[in-house]
């Protein structure tokens, strides 16, 4: 729960201070002190050895599987179980075969699965393949109504649509009510999948949390492959051990930084920040990237609270000017409580830069520009709050797409990604292309829809919900519905850009898609970052605390 109040620290409007008290960290130093989290060295080495043995067996499955449907099911299972980064070459080779196959004889399940697998990997596949499932009246044929497996496959495929692909919109509207009506009749494993993806479709799900949940579903299925199941559990446990080591390092850094203690009005959420990082990339190769990224977003979270929850307008102006200068000498113009934060911000960026290779250090300049841009936009929103100004939706989005952090945060995720993050990537991102704009729209609007009542109750600046209501003279319910439509359009933009990009690596585009997925999860029912004692705690426990018994 939050406690809100307004404090007047002077007579001028610019000196009104909001005071919002967030609940303290629910984790404390758990990931620093709890030595029982990690597996013993001997146990870890046994798991690593067994994983290598199982990897050989799975590679043999690719070689020995000539049936295309079996190959598609193998790839789908491997991806859902979080094993795909072990078999990138095998999957790419298999997808080339799948792309060439004649699918005219395929049923609903096979057609939808092929479409989804190919689209997920950036292949253009025509939606005309679904026309054979429609009758003369233009609707999907009624004989499909009882095919739960096929309907679920169609439902998940429909979320990879782009603009103009109306048949996928129709497929979504057709499949969802049918799945709901069939749910009580399904066997346990399929029912669990339907429930999971009706709550949030596959394309919008965070990978590492999906993997953790899907392993439990997969082990109950009659068609499970025990080699894949054992591999998935061991692999997850090894990943979890790595994550726990990383989180211990970042937690020690956070407590040494002491910002949560000195700025007690901010959200103390380092564990949640790290979990957020995992939603963008969970592969072991990105360990260094995750440490960099965690530091950046934890500092941005503090900035957000300074501008949004505590700082007076004059203090926000002073901080913005200091950040624009980006020099230690700029602290002279800051109030005491901001001097420490400002120096820690500069020092952290300097330390990150020192960790980079010589030919990568330029990346920090792009990240600094992102910080400066978000500070300017935060200041504008602070003015709206003080003045009780409700901007038009267009004016709102001009600033709030930046303050959503959905441009800065993915940019930060590129910094430690090695050779794939070229200067061209940073130039492309800085130009605010459609893929970045779509990512920002998804994050901004989902945040506003979920947080509207809470933030209005404490006197925050107007959200996009209020701006839409003012522009169109409508109520909150209708405004949220229309804004949700904008989110769906943004997803189609992102899907389109995922297919169209030729000069930007798919690994970069995946960061934007994954960040958008994290927004869908965090704002599914409430702001799980701010109110982290709710569903967020359970998700973190699943991913970072509870290992699979093996």
UniProtKB/Swiss-Prot annotation:
Q: How is the cofactor bound?
A: Magnesium, manganese, cobalt or nickel, but not zinc or copper. Binds 3 magnesium ions per subunit.
Compartments in which it is found: Cytoplasm
Return the Gene3D superfamilies for the record: Farnesyl Diphosphate Synthase, Terpene synthase, N-terminal domain
Task: Tell me which residues bind Mg(2+) 3.
Answer: 455
> So what does this one do?
Involved in the biosynthesis of germacrene D. Can use farnesyl diphosphate as substrate, but not geranyl diphosphate. Produces mainly (+)-germacrene D along with germacrene B and a number of minor by-products.
Q: Which family does it belong to?
A: Belongs to the terpene synthase family. Tpsa subfamily.
Supply the name of the protein: (+)-germacrene D synthase
């Amino acid at each position: 729960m939050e406690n809100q109040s307004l404090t007047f620290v002077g007579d001028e409007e610019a000196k009104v201070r909001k005071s919002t008290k967030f609940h303290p960290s629910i984790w404390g130093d758990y990931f620093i002190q709890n030595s029982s989290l990690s597996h013993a060295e001997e146990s870890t080495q046994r798991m690593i050895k067994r994983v290598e043995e199982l990897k050989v067996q799975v590679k043999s499955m690719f070689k020995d599987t000539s049936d295309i449907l079996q190959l598609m099911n193998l790839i789908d299972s491997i991806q859902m179980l979080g094993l795909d980064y072990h078999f990138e070459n095998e999957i790419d080779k298999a997808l080339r075969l799948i792309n060439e196959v004649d699918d005219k004889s395929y049923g609903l399940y096979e057609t939808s699965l092929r479409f989804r697998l190919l689209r997920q990997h950036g292949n253009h596949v025509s939606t005309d393949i679904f026309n054979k499932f429609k009758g003369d009246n233009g609707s999907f044929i009624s004989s499909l109504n009882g095919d739960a497996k096929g309907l679920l496959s169609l439902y998940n495929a429909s979320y990879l649509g782009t603009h103009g692909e109306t048949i996928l919109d129709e497929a979504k509207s057709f499949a969802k009510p049918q799945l709901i009506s069939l749910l009580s009749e399904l066997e346990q494993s399929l029912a669990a999948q339907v429930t999971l993806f009706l709550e949030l479709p596959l394309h919008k799900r965070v990978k590492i949390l999906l993997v953790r949940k899907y392993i439990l579903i997969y082990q109950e299925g009659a068609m499970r492959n025990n080699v894949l199941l054992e591999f998935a559990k061991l692999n997850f446990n090894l990943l979890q051990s790595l994550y726990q080591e990383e989180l211990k390092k970042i937690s020690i850094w956070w407590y040494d930084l002491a910002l949560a203690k000195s700025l007690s009005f901010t959200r103390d959420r380092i564990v949640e920040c790290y979990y957020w990082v995992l939603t963008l990339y969970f592969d072991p190769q990105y360990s260094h990237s995750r440490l960099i990224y965690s530091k950046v977003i934890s500092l941005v979270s503090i900035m957000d609270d300074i501008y949004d929850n505590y700082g007076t307008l004059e203090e926000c102006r002073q901080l913005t000017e200091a950040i624009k200068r980006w020099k230690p000498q700029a602290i002279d113009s800051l109030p005491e409580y901001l001097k420490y934060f400002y120096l820690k911000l500069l020092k952290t960026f300097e330390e990150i830069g020192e960790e980079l290779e010589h030919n990568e250090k330029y990346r920090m300049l792009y990240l600094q520009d992102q910080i400066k841009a978000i500070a300017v936009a935060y200041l504008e929103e602070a003015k709206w709050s003080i003045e009780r100004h409700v901007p038009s939706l267009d004016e709102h989005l001009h600033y709030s797409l930046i303050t959503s952090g959905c441009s800065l945060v993915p940019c930060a995720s590129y910094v430690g990604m090695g050779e794939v993050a070229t200067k061209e990537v940073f130039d492309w991102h800085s130009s605010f292309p459609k893929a970045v704009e779509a990512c920002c729209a998804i994050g901004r609007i989902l945040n506003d829809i979920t947080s509207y009542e809470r933030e209005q109750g404490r006197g925050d600046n107007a959200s996009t919900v209020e701006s839409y209501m003012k522009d169109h003279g409508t109520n909150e319910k209708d405004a949220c519905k229309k804004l949700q439509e904008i989110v769906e359009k943004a997803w189609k933009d992102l899907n389109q850009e995922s297919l169209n990009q030729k000069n930007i690596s798919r690994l970069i585009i995946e960061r934007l898609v994954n960040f958008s997925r994290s927004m869908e999860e965090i704002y599914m029912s409430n702001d799980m970052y701010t109110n982290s004692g709710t569903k967020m705690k359970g998700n973190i426990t699943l991913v970072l605390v509870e290992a699979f018994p093996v």
